[in-house]
C-alpha cells in the first residue's frame, strides 16, 4: 500500500516544553503517561482522543509533544497541569509550537548548571544550592525524607 500524499495526511503540530526543575531526569514513557493523564483529566476522554497527544522525545530538560492541528492550545494548557512524573515533582512550561520538530530543535538551548556547589542554612534546615543562568537558584533540602525544593534568585540568596 502506498503512503498518502502530503495533502491527504493529518496535519500535526509539535509543542516544545521545558521541564522544571532543570535537574529532573524523566523517562519518556513516564512523561507520556503523565501527559495523557493531564489531557484526559482536563479535556475529557473524547477531546483528548481527538487531540491525540504523544510524547515524541524527552531529553536535555525539554519535552516535545505531538498533537493534531487545531488542538495545540488545549494540549499546551494540559501540559501546564502536569505536576509529577513517576513520583518526581516537576512543572512543564510551554516554550514554542511549530509544525516541524526541526524548528523546535533550533529553539532548544542547553541548560547548564553553573559551578559552585554550596550549602546554606535557612532556619534550622540545611539546603544544597544549585545555580543556573539568569540568576536562578534552586535550594534542595538536605536529608533522606520529606525533601522540599525552594526557588530563589541571587538577590534572595544574598539577603539570607
Curated annotation (Swiss-Prot):
Enumerate the subcellular locations listed in this protein's record, separating them with semicolons. Cytoplasm
Any Pfam family: RNase_P_Rpp14
SUPFAM superfamilies the UniProt entry points to: Rnp2-like
**What UniProt keywords apply to this chain's record, in alphabetical order?**
Cytoplasm, Endonuclease, Hydrolase, Nuclease, tRNA processing
| InterPro entries with a match to the protein in the record | Pop5/Rpp14/Rnp2-like, Rnp2-like_sf
Keyword Hydrolase (UniProt): yes
Q: What cystine linkages occur within this chain?
A: none
> By what name is this protein known?
Ribonuclease P protein component 2
What taxonomic lineage is listed for the species of origin? Answer: Archaea, Methanobacteriati, Methanobacteriota, Stenosarchaea group, Methanomicrobia
Gene of origin?
A: rnp2
Amino acid at each position: 500500500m502506498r503512503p498518502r500524499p502530503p495533502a491527504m495526511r493529518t496535519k500535526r503540530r509539535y509543542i516544545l516544553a521545558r521541564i522544571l526543575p532543570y535537574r529532573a531526569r524523566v523517562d519518556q514513557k513516564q512523561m507520556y503517561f503523565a501527559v495523557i493523564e493531564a489531557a484526559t483529566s482536563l479535556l475529557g476522554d473524547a477531546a483528548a482522543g481527538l487531540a491525540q497527544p504523544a510524547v515524541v522525545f524527552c531529553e536535555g530538560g525539554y519535552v516535545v509533544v505531538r498533537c493534531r492541528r487545531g488542538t495545540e492550545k488545549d494540549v499546551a494548557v494540559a501540559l501546564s497541569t502536569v505536576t509529577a512524573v513517576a513520583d518526581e515533582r516537576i512543572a512543564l512550561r510551554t516554550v514554542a509550537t511549530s509544525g516541524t520538530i526541526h524548528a523546535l530543535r533550533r529553539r532548544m538551548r542547553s541548560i547548564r548548571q553553573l559551578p559552585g556547589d554550596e550549602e546554606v542554612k535557612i532556619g534550622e534546615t540545611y539546603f544544597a544550592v544549585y545555580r543556573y543562568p539568569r540568576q536562578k537558584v534552586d535550594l534542595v533540602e538536605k536529608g533522606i525524607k520529606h525533601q522540599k525544593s525552594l526557588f530563589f534568585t541571587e538577590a534572595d540568596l544574598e539577603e539570607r
